C-alpha cells in the first residue's frame, strides 16, 4: 500500500476510474452481443454508438472500433 498521501489519493482515483471504465466496456460488449443474437437496424445503431463512446473515452483503439463496426455491418447485411 502507498505511504505518500498523493499516492494514496491516486490509488483511490484509479480504483474509481477502473470501475467506470469496466462498466463502459461491459456495456459495449453487451450491446454487441445483443446485436449478434438478433441483428436488426436498431440494435446495430445501439452497438455502434456504444463502440464509438468507448473509443472516444480511450477504452479501445480507433482501429478496433472501426474493425468491430465493420464486422457488425457485414452481419447486418
Swiss-Prot record:
UniProt KW keywords? Ribonucleoprotein, Ribosomal protein, RNA-binding, rRNA-binding
One Gene Ontology cellular component annotation? cytosol
In Gene Ontology terms, what is one molecular function of this protein?
A: small ribosomal subunit rRNA binding
Per the record's keyword annotation, is rRNA-binding included, yes or no? yes
Q: Does the keyword field hold Ribonucleoprotein?
A: yes
Give the GO biological process terms.
translation
Entries under Pfam families matching the protein: Ribosomal_S20p
Q: Which HAMAP family match?
A: Ribosomal_bS20
Q: What does this protein do?
A: Binds directly to 16S ribosomal RNA.
Family, per entry: Belongs to the bacterial ribosomal protein bS20 family.
- Protein name as catalogued: Small ribosomal subunit protein bS20
